[in-house]
């Protein structure tokens, strides 16, 4: 249900750090939104450190684009901005000015995961009951 695309300077994060960040982002999102962790996706993409600019000047920040279903209030969106950012800084030792995080909301009916159309915001309980078997299959696959 959520996709966090983390764009980082090439060779700036080792595998253990990526694992810790993915786990932290997943756990924050799952706790704030109250969804199973299997519906949180995190991907890391490395970019050439000389290819990123801010204000026309070279910059080597880490950029996180979080895509999630629309409908969450400003308090929830605020938590989804501040908590992953704080986790990132805690895991990496980076300072807040070294990370840029934005959220992109999409209509749930424009989203699909594991072959299932996703529920509209507020309809998760009914949807979960209707897809118990598929969700169990996803959990068993890891």
Language-model features and meaning:
Residues 1-142:
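A domain-level signal for the structural core that forms small-molecule/cofactor-binding pockets
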């Amino acid at each position: 249900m959520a996709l966090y695309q983390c764009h980082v300077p090439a060779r700036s994060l080792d595998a253990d750090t990526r694992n810790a960040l993915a786990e932290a982002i997943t756990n924050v999102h799952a706790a704030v939104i109250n969804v199973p962790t299997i519906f949180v996706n995190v991907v890391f993409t490395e970019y050439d450190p000389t290819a990123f600019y801010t204000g026309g000047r070279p910059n080597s920040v880490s950029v996180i684009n979080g895509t999630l279903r629309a409908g969450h209030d400003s308090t929830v969106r605020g938590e989804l901005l501040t908590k992953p950012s704080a986790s990132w800084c805690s895991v990496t030792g980076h300072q807040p000015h070294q990370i840029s995080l934005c959220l992109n909301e999409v209509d749930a009916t424009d989203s699909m995961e594991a072959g299932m159309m996703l529920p509209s915001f507020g309809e998760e309980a009914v949807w979960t009951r209707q897809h118990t078997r598929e969700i169990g299959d996803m959990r068993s696959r890891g």
